[in-house]
Amino acid sequence: IKSKPEKQQLKEALLHEQKYLCCYCCNRISDDSSHIEHFVPQSKDSGLSLEYSNLHASCQGENGDMKHCGHAKGNDYDKALLISPLDKNCEKRFAYSVNGKIEPSDLSDQGAEYTIKLLALNDERLKKAREEAMWTAGVFYAQGEKERETLIKQYSNPADGKRVPFCNAILYQLRKDQESAGSK
């Protein structure tokens, strides 16, 4: 897309569709703090350059020499391993510890492991931000099934259309606690 207005419209559509979260780390993004990411790099398949399903909004993911998300991925791409944000099972393939670390839900899931490493999703700043998000959300204070259910609904479908940063980690912990409470 050569035209600035068309590119801007595309970016706004992606931001809205992704509820203003980075397609990889789920941190809050805006027009100024994101870029249009080609999931399959243009260098690997130029035919997908303008394919909407190949385009996502990614955070800038840079802090000095440290990079994460789209900037860490660069032109690396292993079709058999890299998990697409559009994969219907994407969220289920990752687990989050209370200290913000992300890991494969199934430790034998090579795709999840590859994705975490390639995108540097365990960057110290990301881990700390996920941990803070879980504490701020009250994940570890939720008392009872009803309160957990209310929080799950709140973080799944926000009224303003913008999901809370790192809501995937928040929801993971809430659902994990819900399952634990149900098995007692």
Regions found by a protein language model. Give the residues of each.
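C-terminal, charged low-complexity interaction regions
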Residues: L107-K184
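Beta-strand-connecting loop/turn residues
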Residues: Y20, D32, N99-K101
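Histidine-centered nuclease catalytic patch
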Residues: Y24-H71, Y77
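Short, charged surface segments at domain edges that flank catalytic/cofactor-binding sites
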Residues: I1-L21, D45-L50
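Catalytic cores of phosphodiester-bond-cleaving enzymes
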Residues: I1, Q8, S84, K88-E91, ...
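Short, well-ordered loop/turn elements at secondary-structure boundaries
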Residues: E17-K19, Y52-S53, K88-C90, S97
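Long, low-complexity, intrinsically disordered segments enriched in glycines and aromatic residues
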Residues: K67-E124
